[in-house]
Regions:
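Short amphipathic alpha-helical coupling elements at transmembrane boundaries
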Residues: 3, 40, 50-53, 67, ...
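Membrane-water interface segments at the C-terminal ends of transmembrane alpha-helices
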Residues: 22-29, 59, 70, 134-165, ...
Length: 255
């Protein structure tokens, strides 16, 4: 087990290194000068040269890449060209809201997807299954931003249950959670649709296993057999999707 984990970590490190090299090369190939972008088109050449030296843009590309890797290793992500502030500080400031929002959305999507997948798998080919699959297809097709606007229009503007924007801070946890509810729902429903479809497929695959037939032969109903014996064996692909969704939700919330 330890050897497998070490191999996976080495594979992850190599993948990240290759991805970083490709991204760095693409950024270098793209036209434009960050220093001239920050100073404007009317900047004097000596001013541009001074800023390039300050940002480290006057050194060879390979040296800049190695400096960037070294900075990443110690948590120095550089300076934002747009906001002219350290990137690490910007990420840290946003994590106070983005991380709870991502966890909130992931909890909602899991709470919605698991029961829906269990119902659909237990009633495969029947009305509940068709209804759940239709709802998940709609959830996948509806854009997040459009659904978010509908939520704001209904619950914030028409009903006045939530605020249309802003975040009050964590001094009042209940007010903070309330402010995150509409964004969390808008992020959670499309992810719940994907998760429900994946879990339904995994549960249907489990239905053909011998231990499910044995559980049914002992008198368990299909929902009972799925809940007691099928869910744990169907969680491997589901946990993979959950990890990917958390990364997607956190990255989207930070951006």
């Amino acid at each position: 087990m330890l050897a497998y984990a070490v191999k996976r970590l080495i594979s992850l490190a190599i993948s990240l290194l290759v991805a970083s090299a490709v991204i760095f090369a693409v950024v270098e190939i793209a036209p434009g000068d960050p220093a001239r972008f920050m100073l404007g088109i009317n900047a004097q050449p000596d001013t541009v040269a001074a800023l390039r030296a300050e940002l480290g843009l006057d050194v060879p590309k390979w040296q800049r890449y190695l400096d960037w890797l070294g900075g990443m290793a110690v948590g120095d992500f550089g300076t934002s060209y747009t906001y002219r502030t350290p990137v690490a500080q910007m990420v840290a400031d946003r994590l106070w809201v983005s991380l709870p929002l991502a966890l909130y959305a992931l909890a909602l999507s899991t709470a919605i997807a698991f029961p829906a997948a269990l119902i659909a798998a237990a009633r495969r080919g029947r009305g509940p299954d068709v209804a759940v699959m239709g709802a998940t297809q709609l959830g996948v097709a509806v854009p997040n931003f459009w659904f978010a606007m509908l939520l704001v229009l209904l619950f914030a503007i028409n009903l006045g249950w939530f605020s249309a924007g802003g975040f009050p801070g964590w001094d009042d946890p209940l007010a903070a959670i309330k402010a995150l509810t509409l964004p969390a729902i808008a992020l959670a429903l499309p992810q719940a649709a994907i998760l429900a479809r994946v879990m339904r497929s995994a549960l249907i695959d489990v239905l053909g296993e011998d231990f499910i037939r044995t559980a049914r032969a002992k008198g368990l109903t299909m929902p009972q057999a799925l809940w007691r014996h099928g869910v744990r064996n169907a969680l491997i692909p589901v946990l993979t999707i959950l990890g990917l969704q958390f990364a997607f939700l956190l990255a989207g919330a930070i951006i």
